[in-house]
């Protein structure tokens, strides 16, 4: 019974995925993921990226966000990216494969940043979802707290932070924490984000 339900759910997800207009557009354009469109919408609204910037990309694989940012920051810009999963190389992206929750991986990432002035930290990280909010939301909140800790460590004054967050327990407290660190904070739900998803994107600018 459980197997049948899981199979039916998987079939629905696959049908929705391949009929999704953003998935289809990503395939036509040769993009790595539909996430490219989410960041494009955010850039149109908030103008986060400029030529020559240094950007940290957390939860980077398969590379949709890094692929987008390369087009915005140009050849003089730099992206330091990290993910637990492997990612095919992108020109202009320094990729570190490892678990961001691991202290040694965090240290290695900070070493790659070095003395660079980071203008944007972005995080599209999400845990493997079990389908149980009581389990998934705390896991997701732990990841976004780590991303905010990275901002504290490397983000230059005036810098920006964009992070995927799942609405639920801890969201309001996290939003207040971000507002204490940045001068302007917006909560975005891009059109390319699936309506049924609890995900939103917090866009914070003007690191204090």
Swiss-Prot record:
GO cellular component assignments: cytoplasm
Subcellular location as annotated: Cytoplasm
rRNA processing is among the record's keywords: yes
Active-site residues, as the UniProt record annotates them: 164
InterPro entries: RNA_methyltr_RlmE, RNA_MeTrfase_FtsJ_dom, rRNA-MeTfrase_E, rRNA_MeTrfase_gammaproteobac, SAM-dependent_MTases_sf
Listed EC numbers: 2.1.1.166
UniProt signal peptide: none
Class of the enzyme per the UniProt entry, highest EC level: transferase
Keyword terms: Cytoplasm, Methyltransferase, rRNA processing, S-adenosyl-L-methionine, Transferase
A Pfam entry, by short name: FtsJ
Binding site for S-adenosyl-L-methionine: 63, 65, 83, 99, 124
Main location group: cytoplasm
SS bonds (residue pairs): none
Coiled coil: none
Keyword flag Metal-binding: no
Protein origin, superkingdom: Bacteria
Record field: catalytic activity: uridine(2552) in 23S rRNA + S-adenosyl-L-methionine = 2'-O-methyluridine(2552) in 23S rRNA + S-adenosyl-L-homocysteine + H(+)
Protein family (similarity comment): Belongs to the class I-like SAM-binding methyltransferase superfamily. RNA methyltransferase RlmE family.
Biological role stated in the UniProt entry: Specifically methylates the uridine in position 2552 of 23S rRNA at the 2'-O position of the ribose in the fully assembled 50S ribosomal subunit.
Matches recorded under NCBIfam families: PRK11188.1 (NF008390), rrmJ (TIGR00438)
Xref: HAMAP family: RNA_methyltr_E
Name of protein: Ribosomal RNA large subunit methyltransferase E
Protein source organism: Salmonella arizonae (strain ATCC BAA-731 / CDC346-86 / RSK2980)
Source organism phylogeny: Bacteria, Pseudomonadati, Pseudomonadota, Gammaproteobacteria, Enterobacterales
């Amino acid at each position: 019974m459980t197997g049948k339900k899981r199979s039916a759910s998987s079939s629905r997800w696959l049908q929705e995925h391949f009929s999704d207009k953003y998935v289809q557009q990503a395939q036509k354009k040769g993009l790595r993921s539909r996430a490219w469109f989410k960041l494009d919408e955010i850039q149109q609204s908030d103008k986060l990226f400029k030529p020559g910037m240094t950007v940290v990309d957390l939860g980077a694989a398969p590379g949709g966000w890094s692929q987008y940012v390369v087009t915005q920051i140009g050849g003089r810009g730099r992206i330091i990216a990290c993910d637990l999963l492997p990612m095919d190389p992108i020109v202009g992206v320094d990729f570190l494969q490892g678990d961001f929750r691991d202290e040694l991986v965090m240290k290695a990432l900070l070493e790659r940043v070095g003395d660079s002035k980071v203008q944007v930290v972005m995080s599209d990280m999400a845990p493997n979802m079990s389908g149980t909010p009581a389990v998934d939301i705390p896991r997701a909140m732990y990841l976004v707290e780590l991303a905010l800790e990275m901002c504290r460590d490397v983000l230059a004054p005036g810098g920006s932070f964009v992070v995927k967050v799942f609405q639920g327990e801890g969201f309001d407290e996290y939003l207040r924490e971000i507002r204490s660190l940045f001068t302007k904070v917006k909560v975005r739900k891009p059109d390319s984000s699936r309506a049924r998803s609890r995900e939103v994107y917090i866009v914070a600018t003007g690191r204090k």
